[in-house]
Amino acid sequence: MVARVWSLMRFLIKGSVAGGAVYLVYDQELLGPSDKSQAALQKAGEVVPPAVYQFSQYVCQQTGLQIPQLPAPPKIYFPIRDSWNAGIMTVMSALSVAPSKAREYSKEGWEYVKARTK
């Protein structure tokens, strides 16, 4: 009984995390124009390090542990605008030709099997 409840809880937690991620991507319009994607990435770069520092300070206060000071993350310039839409276009292009390629490959496979059985 406990195993079933535990597996159900794991499923619900994983589903909630996945649903939250999908909602966040949709709400922030991350699959839309690259301007919004780049702005969201920049916003995350500004917000996440202070949040991690604040959380580590909270953990130190609650547990009494001393967490060593981490070095500052390097500043990396990656022009996401140049590659984001290209990646989306490539994936969508591959998905659009998948049915015809599957038909073509299955036809070739069928011809191969027919040739081998003769």
Curated annotation (Swiss-Prot):
Principal cellular location given in the protein's record: mitochondrion
Membrane topology: Single-pass membrane protein
All ranges on the Mitochondrial intermembrane side of the membrane: 27-118
Gene Ontology biological-process annotations: cristae formation
Coiled-coil annotated spans: none
Statement: the UniProt record of this protein carries the keyword Transmembrane helix: yes
Chain ranges passing through the membrane: 8-26
Topological region Mitochondrial matrix: 1-7
One Pfam family, short name: QIL1
Location of this chain's protein in the cell: Mitochondrion inner membrane
Subunit record text: Component of the mitochondrial contact site and cristae organizing system (MICOS) complex, composed of at least MICOS10/MIC10, CHCHD3/MIC19, CHCHD6/MIC25, APOO/MIC26, MICOS13/MIC13, APOOL/MIC27 and IMMT/MIC60. The complex associates with mitochondrial outer membrane proteins SAMM50, MTX1 and MTX2, and with HSPA9.
UniProt function note: Component of the MICOS complex, a large protein complex of the mitochondrial inner membrane that plays crucial roles in the maintenance of crista junctions, inner membrane architecture, and formation of contact sites to the outer membrane. Constituent of mature MICOS complex, it is required for the formation of cristae junction (CJ) and maintenance of cristae morphology. Required for the incorporation of MICOS10/MIC10 into the MICOS complex.
Recorded family membership: Belongs to the MICOS complex subunit Mic13 family.
Name used for this protein in its record: MICOS complex subunit MIC13
The organism's taxonomic lineage, starting at the top: Eukaryota, Metazoa, Chordata, Craniata, Vertebrata
